[in-house]
Amino acid sequence: MSAGSPKFTVRRIAALSLVSLWLAGCSDTSNPPAPVSSVNGNAPANTNSGMLITPPPKMGTTSTAQQPQIQPVQQPQIQATQQPQIQPVQPVAQQPVQMENGRIVYNRQYGNIPKGSYSGSTYTVKKGDTLFYIAWITGNDFRDLAQRNNIQAPYALNVGQTLQVGNASGTPITGGNAITQADAAEQGVVIKPAQNSTVAVASQPTITYSESSGEQSANKMLPNNKPTATTVTAPVTVPTASTTEPTVSSTSTSTPISTWRWPTEGKVIETFGASEGGNKGIDIAGSKGQAIIATADGRVVYAGNALRGYGNLIIIKHNDDYLSAYAHNDTMLVREQQEVKAGQKIATMGSTGTSSTRLHFEIRYKGKSVNPLRYLPQR
């Protein structure tokens, strides 16, 4: 069949018609395709908004959604580790002290603290110190220590404050067996020089007594170094004491005591006891301010209140053999190294170092306590 025949022409026209109809059907504009420009959010004004194609979420959006999930997990872990570390710190700082009536109370076990362990003549207050603690380690009565340093109740102290504790000799002044053994050893060194006040007084700490007031008798000891007040350490200066004392006491060395006088008026309420732990003198009751006189001529070798339990104490050396002691005085009217006469007023009666107004009176012969009633005239 040739290209110009009528049949070929008809078939060609029919084929073109079918192709035209098919193309016309595919070009229907009732559902226009979404413009490509809507992907970037720039659709034309006449474009149907319902046919916009929403782009898929970006990778950056997904990563930002995961980060908030990590942050809340880390925060609770930090808080949980901080709280247990703060709680146990607070009660530990409060354990050493207690508060009572707005004041700090220190809990000390005094049974484990050596009494009289401090040997200096002054003491500097440190943090945590109390007057009772200082009195304990220096071998003093806290009331006497307060009086000596003009400290009023309730006995408040300041850090750095210097207190006069009276242990200038370097020997702790306490009761108990430890100090007795130390004094006995010291006595063995001093006893061989001339019989002077140093020898007589040094032997006295080994002798104790008790009284009805309930004071501890172990602390009632006469001083062992006060007569040599110019010497700081008596054991070291034994040669000095043996050379100087005979010169001072030579005026009374050979003077016998013909008559003893009663040191005060009043009733004897405690008598002499020779047994161990007994009263090594006599106690005479009286009224505060009552006169105390020297029982015989002599020289004052000690006047002070450094010894716990004695209060204001005066010791008079009458000769190389005899001493007399007057304790619990209210006011002392003589000073150390002062010469006194028999019957001279040396003090007024009081209650320092004890619970009632009284005079504790002792006579010692060559450092040994004797019954004063054997020497005093009967009345």
UniProtKB/Swiss-Prot annotation:
GO terms for molecular function: metalloendopeptidase activity. Disulfide bonds: none annotated. It comes from the Bacteria. Its main location: membrane. Residues 66-97 are annotated as: 4 X 8 AA tandem repeats of Q-Q-P-Q-I-Q-P-V. One of its GO terms (cellular component) is cell division site. A lipid is attached at residue 26 (N-palmitoyl cysteine). It is found in: Cell inner membrane. Residues 121-165 form the LysM domain. Residues 205-252 are annotated as: 4 X 7 AA approximate repeats. Residues 1-25 form the signal peptide. Residues 30-67, 210-231, 240-259 are annotated as: Disordered. SUPFAM superfamilies: Duplicated hybrid motif (SSF51261). PANTHER family: MUREIN HYDROLASE ACTIVATOR NLPD (PTHR21666:SF263), PEPTIDASE-RELATED (PTHR21666). Activator of the cell wall hydrolase AmiC. Required for septal murein cleavage and daughter cell separation during cell division. Belongs to the E.coli NlpD/Haemophilus LppB family. This is Murein hydrolase activator NlpD. It comes from Escherichia coli (strain K12).
